[in-house]
From Swiss-Prot:
Protein name: Trans-enoyl reductase tasC
Keyword Iron-sulfur included in the entry's annotation: no
Family from the record: Belongs to the zinc-containing alcohol dehydrogenase family.
Pathways involved: Secondary metabolite biosynthesis
CDD domains, sorted: enoyl_reductase_like
Keywords associated with the record: NADP, Nucleotide-binding, Oxidoreductase
Binding sites annotated in the UniProt record for substrate: 136-143, 305-309
Keyword Mitochondrion: no
Residue sites binding NADP(+) per the record: 49-52, 196-199, 219-222, 284-285, 374-375
Origin: domain of life: Eukaryota
MF (Gene Ontology): nucleotide binding; oxidoreductase activity, acting on NAD(P)H
Function according to Swiss-Prot or TrEMBL: Trans-enoyl reductase; part of the gene cluster that mediates the biosynthesis of the tetramic acids Sch210971 and Sch210972, potential anti-HIV fungal natural product that contain a decalin core. The PKS module of tasS together with the enoylreductase tasC catalyze the formation of the polyketide unit which is then conjugated to 4-hydroxyl-4-methyl glutamate (HMG) by the condensation domain of the tasS NRPS module.
Amino acid sequence: MTVSNKTQTALVGSPDGAIILSDTAPLPPSQLEDEQVAVAVQAVSLNPVDTKMAGDYHTPGAISGCEFAGVVTAVGPGAASEWGLGPGDRVSAAIMGMNPLRPSIGAFAQHSVAPAHCLLKMRDDWGFAQAAGLGNSWYTVAWALFHVMGLPAGPELEPLHTKHPPPAREPRISIDNPAPNGGGGKRTTVLVSGGSSSTGTCAIQLLKLAGFDVVATSSARNFDLVRSYGADAVFDHSSPSVAADIKAHTRNGLRLALDCITTPDTTRLCYGAIGRTGGRYVSLDPYSEVVAASRAVVRADWVLGPELMGEDVGWPAPHGRKGNPEAKAFCKVWNRTLQGLLDRGAIRTHPQRVRDTGLRGVLEGLDDIREKRVSGEKLVYTLQV
């Protein structure tokens, strides 16, 4: 299938390293690949990564943004046959913006393209703004928990549970998880650092569905928010004794930690909270090697969300890498799992602040994120198209 060959309005990289609004940005390639889907964008959401596309990560002329919702305008043959997608479908998508290998594809635009396995069909009772916040968090966190950390997904997360069992990871950890709604019984605990972030509330929900107890950190003002998403206990990340408090709460037995913030301080917090026998630490960005070297009994790893698209990542090291077929295979199974969770109302999106100022307003939103004026909510912008 083809899309029309005209220019569009989009946020693109400028020659001087800024993000600017352009009315002459290129449309995505007119010829869709087999599993690609073309979408008329109706709403976009912002992520911290959108503010980090500077220096060698910045490509002049490339379109920025990685989450959007809209209406399908054209599909490749595989997107239709394998995923049942067609023109007129309302979808949300997770893609890689500011992509030097595909500079005409990004979320902050009137038109975009996404691989079918990174698209979700919207619920009938959802608007585009609500759906725009789905995407990267739900894919990246699932990859971090149920593959890289090696946690079992459990029967509530089918077909992932049976079709993609987790690989063996070191150190070996015994997991005790009754069915999520099966009453009492011992449950393995996972720490979520950054519980009030969009990835944090996503992680809490997925861990609870998988049958884990969740201990989270956040600022004190967001305690109620974090608890409302299912955290069993919440600790103030700014407290000098937070690591010791978590260690006491878990009786020196914590062995699993997901770091949704990933600074030297949060890595240090997680390492300090993990019990005497060590465990596994997974972050959503590269972690401090210095901190990681402080405890040999803790195995550290980190994940890169765009890897799930299965394509080469053209960003510089340490993010740049060849396409990962294993990540794509995981994502295809996870996509069907996530669609099922969405359809049956088993998950909630992160709290949103919706603005109707379009792509021009996104520039203001990026400044809000840079200046740390956003906490416990996700910025979403509807487009006047």
